[in-house]
Amino acid sequence: MASIQTKLVSQPQTQQPLQNGFFNNYQQNIYRPQGIQSPPQQTPPSQPQQQPILPQQPQPQSQQPLHLQQQQQQQQQQQLLQQQQILQQQQQLLQLQQQQQNLIKQQQHQAQQQNFLHPQAQQVQSQLQLQSQPQPQPQPVNNVNNNNNNNNNNNNNNNNNNNKPFGTNNIHYSLVQQQQLLQQQAQQQLLQQQQHQQLLLQQQQAQQQSSLNNSLNSSGNNSTLNTSNNNNNVLLGANFNNASNPSINIGDPQLNNSNTNNVNNINTNNTNNNNKSGSIDQFGSPQIGVSYVNSSSNSAIPTPPTNQTNGSNSHSPTPVGINSNININSNLQSPQNIQQTILSPNISPNHNNNNNNNNNNNNNNNNNNNNNNKVSEELNEQLRMQQQQRQQQQQQIPQQPMQLLLQQQQQQQAQLQQQQAQLQQQQQAQLQQQQQAQLQQQQQAQQQAQQQAQQQQQQLKIYQQHFGQLQHQIHMLQQQPQNPQTQQQINGLLQQQAQIQQQQAIIIQQMQQMQQNQQIQQNQQLPQQQQQQQQQQQQQQQQAQQLLLQQQLQQQQQQQQQQQLQQAQQAQQQQQQQQQQQAQQQQQQQAQQQQQQQQQQQQQQQQQQQQQQQQQQQQQQQQQQQQQQQQQQQAQQQPQAQQSQQQAQQQQQNQQQPQQLNQNPPNQQLPQQPNQITQQQQQQQHQTNQILQNQQSQQILQLQQLQQQQQQQQQQQQQQQQQQQQQQQQLQQQQQQQQQQQQQQQQQQRQQPNQVQPNQPIDYNKKLELLNHPIWGKVLKETRQQIVLVYELLRMRCEGPHIKRNLFYQGIGLAPFSLSLPILSPSGLINATTGKPILKCTGSATSLYIVEDNNLFFQHNCGEQLVISKLFGAKVVPISTYESFLDHIVNILFNLTLLSPDELNLCTNRKNQPTFPLYQLDNKLSLVNQVQNQNQNQNNNNNNNNNNNNNINCNNANGTNIVISEVKNDINQLQPQQPPPQQQQAIPFVPSPTNDGNSVNNNINNNFINNNSFVNNNNNNNIQPTKSIIGVSNPFQNNNNNNNNNNNNNNNNNNNNNNNNNNNNNNNNNNNNNNNNNTNNNINNNINNQQQLYIQQQQYSQQQQQQQQNPQQQNPQQQNPQQLQQQQHLQQLQQQLLQQQLLQQQQQQQQQQQQQQQMQQQIQQPPQQNIEPINQLSDNQINMQQFNMLNNTNGNFNINNTNNLVRSSVQY
């Protein structure tokens, strides 16, 4: 990084804006951005560097002590060090940003290289693009050396005289403006890099058909733009950028690596008659001491010798324009000379130095020319090698399988991600180090200020003591007789007091100035901190953008991979189709060939047969001729006597011929020898036919084999396709797993939990965390689950975030369905486990009181009383009272440390575990079967003409008032006339240790056959409580003596009806059991969701309490920016969670509405009832009737509320 140099000029001048927003004003703030190297800042011993320090009041140096002067010098040195450190930190940050940008470029470049196509497709695509784009014009090779010479001249000349001091007396520039300039420079660099990338992409495509000479010509040409403006009264040259030249042709990116200094070196020159020169670099900062070019003969300046370019003369004027040799020097002079060159227009720079520098430059240029020739040859060889390697790679790429390419891409992506993560870690570490260093510096400065203040206070104390001593001496002298000596002594003492007062005033002023300086530094640090926060936010935004870019690149790569796979599949399908077509063509060709062969064979056979026939005919003719000759010879030799015999034989033959004609067909007129020949021909034909048949069968077998092979190939191809699909699925699964892992990591990074709404369900994972919390200690998991269930049910029932005790005690029969009750007893009883009395529980709204250990009575607001038996579990929760139980859950939030040791022992003792099942809530689906049971029981009651009802429905109105609604059929007709019968003995209740609720229901039905805790009274419609143990019946007297006979007759009919109803009830029970199992699962899920929400709320409240207990004693502007970011992130997450929760609530409401509609539809279908006339019953008949009903039917005690929460299987 180049050091940033700044300079201010106080004289105001007019501003002339240029193209890029920079002002062509030499008296504005002169700065050098990062692209231009400036000489190192050195301060001469006579003129030390002055930093911006507030002006102090003039004081005599004789009055200031030495240690104060030393302290001030130390402070100044520390301030200088702090500013240097801040500059170094900014440079490091800029370096890191550049590294990130380079990484992004590498990723894009690699992604472009990886996204290859088939070679043929690449050729087609490149041809189309080349047709649409203008091709670069070829240029001579010799221009490369010229351009390189110019660039080398510029680089060499800019590095001359770096050891000379640069003016530093008037340098004062604020860090805020520097940072703004750096931001502008970074934006310009980003724009330039984007343009550079676009040009690279275009030229890579164009260079595939261009030759090596053209690539060499385009690599070095136009890399520097040398322009001139021949104006008479212009002080500075024009400003140019890379974007202003549309014909820049950079060439291969690998060539650019060798010519990195050639880019962005845009130099401008200005020749004037008034001997005033200057130049503006790329970013608008003027360069001082520019040498003059021999552009006109009127110039009074001696022209230096120019470089020989393309055979031009040494003393000829150089043409001004592109590819011209312009020698520019940055001769840094003393500060006075620099001010003169800027402020005074008539003073010219030193020309002798320029001439000397030009001579040195010419020597350097000659060396550079030789080096460039060697470089060009090496570049030629490198380009050839690179092209050969690329061709080989392109030939090898289609042969590589897709899986290897995918793996390589994934590995490269992983490496890039690792590099980015490392860079981010380095950035974070550097930022932390910088923050720590700043804090240490601040602390040191504060300590030093404190030490100085203490020293000053001590000096003040010393002066005060000395002043008091002097006053005492004066007082003693004044008491003595006055003499001139005493007056002189008094005057001397008074002068010393005056000096002491002056020194005290000086110290006080210094202390005030220190305080003011501290305040000013604090005020200066505030904008710096704000800027740091802004920078961090910008870095985070950049990181987020980078992540988005990476995701987009990954998506593009995935899409391209999918496209490539699809193309590969299409190619395979085309290959398959081609193979099939080829196979069909082969089959057709084979069939045609076979036909042709058969035809040829037939023709050959016919020809052979014809030849054989011709040969046979010739043989026959020859034989006949021989026979004739023999006959003639014999005829000559034999006498005439034999002629008569021959004649006789001939006559006999002539007689035999007609007989043969009659016996044989005309075809058999041939002699015996031809018949033998035909038989041989037939045998030959038969053999040939067999051979042909064998050949045909072999051909058929071959065809079948070919078909089988084709089928096998098709199967293999199908298997390959399946494997590819499986691989794609595996890749998708891996991607999903990676996404899930990232989501899990993000969730783990969230330190603070989100706020939880009060009535929302807790997540299952949060519930597990709650149950496994270390605050429970050794408490059993069963007790933990029961406590959590109670709290969830209370939250589900009650409205609002807080639970009211009044609502709880009014709805205690509804909310804690799965509650395991504590061991409760009156104050007179003693608990068997602890040996201590257990107090009676009383609530705020109503009273809870106990008859015995096993039974609990509580009173509703309707004036009626119900009983909760031991079925809910009396020995699970070892808390003394119901109210304390609620306090532990609601107010203390599961803080079990407040429990007594006895209660904790009960919680951790395995012997106290329940041996009975724990009940849970019923869902709405179970209500359907319960309504059917109610309708059947009503049929039984109507048929029996009784006023007793087994099904007592307790409904909750508006969530607060509970009313027991009984189905009362003509209660007033029953009149008490006889005393009540004797009470029957109670059968003890022994619950089964199973976890199945059905077995408990059966036990209850069997055990409570003779129990009847509720009997209707004709005079009082309210149900009265019993004062005995449940399990002992206590019926009241009913005076119904007139209807005994009628009731006996009706009982016989009712028994028959009950038997039928029992069968129906058994079926209904089975349905209920299935529904209960389903609903229990749903309830458990809801409870788990609620518990997680509660835990999140608890953790959030604890963190808020900790923050309140340990507040940060810092200014709001000095807070850690990470905390602010975390808070913002948490707020966003909270909003997302709220939206999700609202959606879940809407879905649940919709489901509930659908279930309610189903229930109403089923309830609206009333069963057919057989109504019979009402008859009066006697007391004995009533008791017997109750006994039969309890024995044969299910006495369900159903308690309902507005939330459809039903307590199941509470039997009496």
Curated annotation (Swiss-Prot):
Which InterPro entries is this protein grouped with? Answer: Sdc1/DPY30
Q: Which domain of life is it from?
A: Eukaryota
Chain residue ranges for the region called Disordered: 1-70, 119-169, 211-231, 248-374, 655-681, 935-957, 973-1125
Skewed-composition ranges (Polar residues): 1-31, 276-285, 292-317, 341-351
Q: List the disulfide bonds.
A: none
Q: Where is the composition biased (Low complexity)?
A: 48-70, 119-163, 256-275, 322-340, 352-373, 998-1022, 1037-1125
CC annotations in GO: Set1C/COMPASS complex
What PANTHER family does the annotation carry?
Answer: DPY30 DOMAIN CONTAINING 2, DPY30-RELATED
The protein's name: Putative uncharacterized protein DDB_G0271606
Instruction: Tell me the organism.
Output: Dictyostelium discoideum
